[in-house]
Structure formats: C-alpha cells, structure tokens
C-alpha cells in the first residue's frame, strides 16, 4: 500500500497586520478531525479497498458492482458515519460538519489519496455539488425525496451539463431545451462526458437546460431534476478520459428525448 509523507503545520509562521486573508493554514479546531480522517483512511479504507478490488475480479459486467463489493463498501461507510466522518463538504452544522472551505480543502486532499475514501465518507463528486444545490434551493419535497437519501449515502447522482457541439463550460452556450407544455417541461438535447451516470446506484440527474431563449444571455438557463429512470433518458455509451472509461461509474454520452417532467 502506498505510504504518504505527512507535512506538519508550520508553527513558527507569523502573520503581519492585514495578512489574515493570506493565512492558508489549517485551523486548530479542525486538526483532530483531520488526523481522524488520516487514521481512518489508513486503518479502514485502504484495507477495504483491497477487499473491494478482489471482490470485483470475477464480475462479467464491468458496468456493475458485485454484491460483495457493495457489502464491504457499506460496512466501511457505516463505520465512517458512526465515527462522525461524514458529509464534510456542506458548510452548515445541520447537514454537514460546519467546516470552512479552507479546512475542508485539507481533508479533501487526504480523501484524494485513496480511490474509495471520498465515497466511504460520502464526499464524492458529483454528489457533493448536487447535494449543495438541493440543500440551498430545493423544495421541501425535493429535499425529502432526493437530498435525504444522498446525505445518507443511499443513492448516487449526476450533473448533466456538458454538450458535444458547444463550449458548454459557459452555460450561456447550452443548447438542450426545456419547453413548458401545459404543466410539464419537455426536454430535448444531447449531453457529453456526464460523470456517474453509468453507476447503477445513480437515481437522480440535475440537468442544465435552456428554458427562456428570449431572456438576457445569463438568464436563459434552468436546472431541472430528472429521475434517472425517466422515459427518454438514454445512455448512448461511455466516453474516454486519458484512455479510460472509468467503469462502472463512467463519463457518458447521453440523449434526452421528449422527456416529460
């Protein structure tokens, strides 16, 4: 197992007046949590990762998990939850740990050293960003149906934005449309490199669409929640990043055809 060098916090650093915004040190308050995360990764996640890999060696479908893989992962997740190592990314105390972004960055740097650490502590993308969207602007019903199981680590999600024919990192270029017909939105479009849709546990999509083409360029877009099993949601196939398709989660080419929401 790879060993990582620990670089301790500098203790003799002195701030000049007015330099508070440039202080990028970890806070003293989060140090015990950070150390706990490191220990949990070493003692629980890394051994579990070996067992997880072995449990998947015999599977015939690369786009799935074996029951044994899910079992060992859930055991580690439940242990993390019991030890309070859960949902670090949300800044409020009710749904998250109440961490500042800087302190979370230190913890995230440790999570990134092990392929399954983030998921074990329910801090995997794109779920983290999707949960924050739901937590901040979701309705009570949306939070109960989608945010709650995401916070509990029971389901996975995807954020559906990138498109094949436009520079869609700029949302003003989005071409996928959602038109209001009666009391339903009808969605049509094509999406590229959608992370996580291949995961069989993915149950909800947050889809970036254009709903008001006549508005100012920055006000034409909306995000619509689309259940993964909605008729018209079609995965055309996996796409490759640095020669890898990252099965079973994947980065997918998708078509959205006459989806009614």
Question: Where does each model-flagged region fall?
Answer:
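Amphipathic, small/basic residue-rich leader segments at the start of a protein or domain
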Residues: 1-125, 136, 141-145, 149
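Conserved small/polar residues in nucleotide/adenosyl-binding loops
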Residues: 259-261
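A short core secondary-structure module
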Residues: 184, 188-235
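Flexible, small-/acidic-enriched active-site or ligand-binding loops
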Residues: 173, 229-256
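Hydrophobic, small-residue-rich alpha-helical packing segments that form membrane-like cores
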Residues: 166-170, 185
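A structural signal for short hydrophobic beta-strand segments in well-ordered beta-sheet cores
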Residues: 176-179
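Flexible, glycine-rich active-site loops centered on histidine and acidic residues
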Residues: 131-137, 159-160, 214
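A short, Trp-centered hydrophobic/proline-enriched beta-strand micro-motif
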Residues: 153-162
């Amino acid at each position: 197992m790879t060993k990582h060098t620990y670089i301790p916090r500098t203790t003799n650093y002195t701030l000049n007046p007015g330099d508070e915004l440039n202080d990028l040190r970890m806070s003293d308050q989060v140090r015990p949590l950070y150390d706990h995360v490191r220990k949990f990764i070493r003692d629980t996640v890394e051994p579990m990762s070996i067992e997880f890999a072995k449990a998947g060696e015999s599977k015939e479908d690369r786009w799935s998990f074996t029951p044994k893989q899910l079992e060992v992962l859930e055991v580690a997740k439940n242990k993390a939850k019991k030890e309070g190592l859960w949902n670090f990314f949300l800044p409020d105390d009710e749904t998250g740990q109440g961490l500042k972004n800087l302190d979370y960055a230190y913890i995230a740097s440790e999570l990134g050293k092990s392929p399954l650490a983030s998921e074990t502590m329910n801090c995997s993308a794109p779920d983290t960003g999707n949960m924050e969207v739901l937590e901040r602007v979701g309705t009570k019903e949306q939070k109960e149906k989608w945010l709650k199981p995401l916070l509990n680590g029971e389901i996975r999600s995807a954020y559906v934005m990138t498109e094949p024919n436009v520079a869609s990192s700029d949302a003003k270029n989005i071409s996928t449309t959602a038109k209001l017909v009666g009391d339903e939105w009808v969605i049509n479009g094509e999406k590229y490199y959608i992370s996580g849709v291949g995961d069989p546990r993915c149950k909800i999509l947050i889809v970036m669409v254009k709903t008001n083409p006549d508005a100012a360029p920055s006000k034409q877009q909306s995000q619509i929640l689309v259940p993964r099993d909605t008729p018209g949601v079609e995965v055309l196939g996996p796409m490759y990043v640095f020669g890898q398709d990252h099965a079973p989660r994947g980065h997918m080419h998708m078509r959205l055809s006459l989806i009614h929401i």
